[in-house]
Design a protein with these regions (language model features):
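Structural scaffold elements adjacent to functional motifs in cytosolic proteins
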Residues: 48-50
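Rhodanese-like catalytic fold shared by cysteine-dependent sulfurtransferases
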Residues: 2-10, 19-46, 55-87, 93-131
């Protein structure tokens, strides 16, 4: 009985690690660089959704980006409905909140969602235009 219990515990740990690695790989596949985001955006092939707070947005933002703070994203999804089948790039300060936004949008049925690596900080460091 003890051997079976140990086997079950070990199996559970291996399974949990497998899902964790798979999730990390999925998020990596959904990430794009600021340069890639800029190119998609400039060619009107994508919309950028900035999920930072109002104070962060007012300080600096990407021209033409849609501003919806992460805490309001679920209730404001109807504002993004027209982009459901278009590429949507989520962006925040460093990439953490935008990764959460990516999950929200995918769960809501958005099919082409990307998280911009490094957020507005990486965009600015790349010398790309901000307001």
């Amino acid at each position: 009985m003890r051997v079976f219990s140990k086997y079950c515990q070990l199996s559970f740990i291996v399974l949990l690690m497998t899902f964790t690695v798979a999730k990390a790989e999925m998020n990596e596949a959904d990430s794009i660089s600021p340069k890639q985001a800029s190119e998609m955006y400039a060619e009107h092939k994508a919309v950028i959704v900035d999920v930072r707070e109002d104070s962060e947005w007012n300080e600096q933002h990407i021209p033409g980006a849609i501003h919806i703070p992460l805490a309001q994203l679920n209730e404001r999804l109807p504002e993004l409905k027209q982009y459901k089948d278009s590429p949507v790039i989520t962006q925040c300060r460093t990439g953490r909140r935008s990764a959460q936004a990516l999950d929200v949008l995918k769960s809501a049925g958005f099919s082409k969602v990307y998280n911009m690596d490094g957020g507005i900080k990486a965009w600015d460091d790349a010398g790309l235009k901000t307001e």
